[in-house]
UniProtKB/Swiss-Prot annotation:
It comes from the Bacteria. GO terms for cellular component: cytoplasm. HAMAP family: Trigger_factor_Tig. Belongs to the FKBP-type PPIase family. Tig subfamily. This is Trigger factor.
C-alpha cells in the first residue's frame, strides 16, 4: 500500500492511498462468484457462467463498485494508521483511479484532531459551591416532605386559603358566549397549584363552600388555543367544598408509616442523616471533579476546533439519549409526542453544549496521552464485567458491542479524570 498525506489547512488534509491488485484480484473472484448465482444467461445454467464470458458480456468493471465497497473500509483504516493520523470525522472519499489491472488510487479529505497545548492540570485550586455538612434543617425538611405526602384532605368550614383544595363547577364565556373546553363539574383544584390560567385560583381565595364567584381572567397571548389567546373570559364558579390538608402528627407512628424499617422518629432522623450525608458527599465530589476539569480546560489551548467535531458530538449525544430511552422501554416517537418536541429540538439542545463537551474531551484525552496512561487486559475485563452488571447484559454481549480499543480509551479517560480530580484542592 502506498500512503501519503498532504496538509491543506489547519486540521485538514488529503490522505492518498492505494488498494493493490493483490487485494483486488481475490475480491473480484469472490464478488463474481456471488453475482453469477443470480445471473440468467442463455446457453448457461444459472450460476455456472464462466468468468471469461461474464467479462466479455458485462465487463469486469461492472464488479468494481462491489469490490471497492468491500475493500475500502479496511484500506482506509490501514492508511490512517500508517500515516499516523487521528481522524475525527467521516472522510470525503474520491476514487481518483480505478483502472483495470492497476492499483486503485483513493483520495480522502480528512479532518484531524486539533493540537491541544496543555496548561496546568495537576494540583489545581478550585472553588465549589456545595455544602458537605448535613444540618438538622436538612433532615427536618426531608421528613416534612414525606409527612406532607401522607397528608389527607379534610372538609373545612372556613374560607379557602392558598394550599387548600376546592371542589368546583365552572362555566366559562367570552362576551356572554360559552366556548369549548370552558366547562367543568366537581373539579378538584389546588389553590396555588397553577393548574388554571393566571388569576383564576387567586380569585377563589377567601370564599367558602356554597358561594358562586364570577372569576374574570385574560387568557395569555401564547395560549395553546389560538381562538382564546389574549381574550378576557368570565367563569361562573360554584364552590361545593373547601378542603384543607391535614398532616399526621410528628411522632414514632409517622416514622413507621414513612419507613417500615424504623421503629422511632429518632431512628428515621438518623437514617435520613446518613442518606443525606452520602448524597451530599457524592454531590461534593461531582462538583470538585467538574470544577477541576473546567479549570484544566480553561488552562489549555486548542488550536482551531473543527466544526465537524461539534457535529459528531451532537450526533453522538442524540444517539446516546435515544438509546437510553429505548433501554428504558420508551419509544422515541412517543417521547417526542408527549413532550411536544422534535428530534431537531433535541439536536438544538445538544448543539448548545457540544462545543464545551468537545473541548473537555480533547483536553482529557491529551492528559491521558501526556501521562502515558494505558489499560491492562485485567482492567479491560473488569470494565466489561462492570458494564454488563450496570446494564443487565451478558459479558459476551458487551464484548460484541464494544471493541478492546474503545474500552481501553474509556479506561484511560477515567484515569485522566481521576488524576485531575484527586490532585485538586478546594479553596
Amino acid at each position: 500500500m502506498s500512503v501519503s498525506f498532504e496538509n491543506k489547512e489547519t486540521n485538514r488534509g488529503v490522505l492518498t492511498f492505494t488498494i493493490s491488485q493483490d487485494q483486488i484480484k481475490p475480491e473480484l473472484d469472490r464478488v463474481f462468484k456471488s453475482v453469477k448465482k443470480s445471473l440468467n444467461v442463455p446457453g448457461f445454467r444459472k450460476g455456472h457462467l464462466p468468468r471469461p464470458i461474464f467479462d466479455k458480456k458485462f465487463g469486469e468493471e461492472s464488479l468494481y463498485q462491489d469490490v471497492m465497497n468491500a475493500l475500502l473500509p479496511n484500506a482506509y483504516e490501514a492508511a490512517v494508521k500508517e500515516a499516523g493520523l487521528e481522524v475525527v470525522a467521516q472522510p470525503k472519499i474520491d476514487v481518483t483511479s480505478m483502472e483495470k489491472g492497476q492499483d486503485w488510487v483513493i483520495a480522502a479529505e480528512v479532518v484531524t484532531k486539533p493540537e491541544v497545548k496543555l496548561g496546568d492540570y495537576k494540583n489545581l485550586e478550585v472553588s465549589v459551591d456545595v455544602e458537605k455538612e448535613v444540618t438538622d434543617a436538612d433532615v427536618e425538611e426531608r421528613i416534612e416532605r414525606e409527612r406532607n405526602n401522607l397528608a389527607e384532605l379534610v372538609i373545612k368550614e372556613a374560607a379557602a386559603e392558598n394550599g387548600d383544595t376546592v371542589v368546583i363547577d365552572f362555566v366559562g364565556s367570552i362576551d356572554g358566549v360559552e366556548f369549548d373546553g370552558g366547562k367543568g363539574e366537581n373539579f378538584s383544584l389546588g389553590l396555588g397549584s397553577g393548574q388554571f390560567i393566571p388569576g383564576f385560583e387567586d380569585q377563589l381565595v377567601g370564599h367558602s363552600a356554597g358561594e358562586t364567584v364570577d372569576v374574570i381572567v385574560t387568557f395569555p397571548e401564547d395560549y395553546q388555543a389560538e381562538d382564546l389567546a389574549g381574550k378576557e373570559a368570565k367563569f361562573v364558579t360554584t364552590i361545593h367544598e373547601v378542603k384543607a390538608k391535614e398532616v399526621p402528627a410528628l411522632d414514632d407512628e409517622l416514622a413507621k408509616d414513612i419507613d417500615e424499617e424504623v421503629e422511632t422518629l429518632a431512628d428515621l432522623k438518623e437514617k435520613y442523616r446518613k442518606e443525606l450525608a452520602a448524597a451530599k458527599e457524592e454531590a461534593y465530589k461531582d462538583a470538585v471533579e467538574g470544577a477541576a476539569i473546567d479549570t484544566a480546560v480553561e488552562n489549555a489551548e486548542i488550536v482551531e476546533l473543527p466544526e465537524e467535531m461539534i457535529h459528531e458530538e451532537v450526533h453522538r449525544s442524540v444517539n446516546e439519549f435515544l438509546g437510553n430511552l429505548q433501554r428504558q422501554g420508551i419509544n422515541p416517537d412517543m417521547y417526542f409526542q408527549i413532550t411536544g418536541t422534535t428530534q431537531e429540538d433535541l439536536h438544538n439542545q445538544y448543539q448548545a453544549e457540544a462545543e464545551s463537551r468537545t473541548k473537555t474531551n480533547l483536553v482529557i484525552e491529551a492528559v491521558a496521552k501526556a501521562e502515558g496512561f494505558d489499560a491492562s487486559e485485567e482492567e479491560i475485563q473488569k470494565e466489561v464485567e462492570q458494564l454488563a452488571a450496570d446494564y443487565n447484559m451478558e459479558v459476551a454481549q458487551v464484548q460484541s458491542l464494544l471493541s478492546a480499543d474503545m474500552l481501553k480509551h474509556d479506561i484511560t479517560i477515567k484515569k485522566a479524570v481521576e488524576l485531575i480530580t484527586s490532585t485538586a484542592t478546594v479553596k
